[in-house]
């Protein structure tokens, strides 16, 4: 292989909340870089996952699920999602095969129809939950009042069904280009960001109601104490004292469970033993305060 035959490009992944975008990205790169949860709006930043082979590199942008904004953070998330469309060489629009086409899908489709000269793929995800005879009806429901799809792929991000074929297809359509990142690099986000997201994932998995959406995580310190252990200090940010009490739990049981689960994932990520300390802090209405959003890493100029 010569450098002139190397292919590369950027692919934006967009869709409603909870259709499996982050699961698909993690399936492709083979590591957990985007957090997953049954809560809507899990992804808040555009996560760039990097897939590299001997002759190609695809940089994937996993956008926040598009929803009606309820606060400044929500507005940031939606703007972040649509800005990715203008950066991409191709777009993957992911829908949930187990759910009927809805207003959220139509809202995204309207924006996709404004995109010119960029191939748009329709990915029908979660086909493992669908009766085989129903697949054609699902595909047909996305043919009217929609862009002309470059390709339609039924997939299961969870099981991996048809994902290798999808990757082969997108690589075949890329133009020749440079290798933007080292072959062993899986994301362009710094280590602190990914660690913080792994902690936030555990909060999302273990709490309910308004608590998951009110949480941010700040990594205060990462220090290697010796050759075998990494010391991490993290602050879990909430908006109200009642939320702080929920996350701490009775006699500290909840915060201990969050820390234990997060530590295991962080150790797998870093390949070393981790000593994780977590604190819970109250920042009133941080989701509606632009300065607080910037401090916590949601910076519009980055997107």
Swiss-Prot record:
Record region (G4): 125-128
Record domain Era-type G: where: 7-176
GO biological process, one term: ribosomal small subunit assembly
Gene Ontology, cellular component aspect: cytosol; plasma membrane
Region G3, annotated ranges: 62-65
Ranges where the record places region G5: 155-157
Subunit structure: Monomer.
UniProt name for this protein: GTPase Era
Annotated organism of origin: Leuconostoc mesenteroides subsp. mesenteroides (strain ATCC 8293 / DSM 20343 / BCRC 11652 / CCM 1803 / JCM 6124 / NCDO 523 / NBRC 100496 / NCIMB 8023 / NCTC 12954 / NRRL B-1118 / 37Y)
Lineage: Bacteria, Bacillati, Bacillota, Bacilli, Lactobacillales
């Amino acid at each position: 292989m010569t450098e002139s035959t190397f292919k590369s490009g950027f692919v934006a992944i967009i869709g409603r909340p909870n259709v499996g975008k982050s699961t698909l990205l993690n399936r492709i790169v083979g590591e957990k870089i985007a957090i997953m949860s049954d809560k809507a709006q899990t992804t808040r930043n555009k996560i760039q996952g990097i897939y590299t082979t001997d002759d190609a590199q695809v940089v994937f942008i996993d956008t926040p699920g598009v929803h009606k904004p309820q606060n400044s953070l929500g507005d940031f998330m939606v703007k972040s999602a649509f800005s990715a469309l203008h950066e991409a060489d191709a777009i993957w629009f992911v829908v949930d095969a187990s759910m009927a086409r809805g207003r959220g899908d139509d809202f995204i489709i309207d924006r996709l129809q404004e995109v010119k000269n960029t191939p748009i793929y329709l990915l029908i995800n979660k086909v493992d939950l669908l009766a085989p005879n129903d697949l054609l009806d699902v595909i047909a429901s996305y043919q009217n009042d929609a862009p002309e799809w470059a390709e339609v792929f039924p997939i299961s991000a969870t099981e991996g069904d048809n994902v290798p074929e999808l990757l082969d297809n997108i690589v075949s359509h890329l133009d020749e280009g440079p290798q933007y990142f080292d072959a062993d690099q899986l994301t362009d986000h710094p280590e602190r960001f990914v660690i913080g997201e792994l902690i936030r994932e555990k909060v999302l998995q273990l709490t309910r109601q308004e608590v998951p959406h009110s949480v941010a995580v700040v990594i205060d310190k990462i220090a290697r104490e010796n050759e075998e252990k990494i010391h991490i200090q993290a602050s879990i940010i909430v908006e109200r004292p009642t939320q702080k009490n929920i996350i701490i739990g009775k006699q500290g049981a909840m915060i201990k469970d969050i820390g234990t689960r997060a530590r295991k994932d962080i150790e797998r990520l870093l390949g070393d033993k981790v000593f994780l300390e977590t604190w819970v802090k109250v920042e009133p209405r941080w989701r509606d305060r632009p300065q607080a959003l910037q401090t916590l890493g949601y910076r519009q100029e980055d997107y």
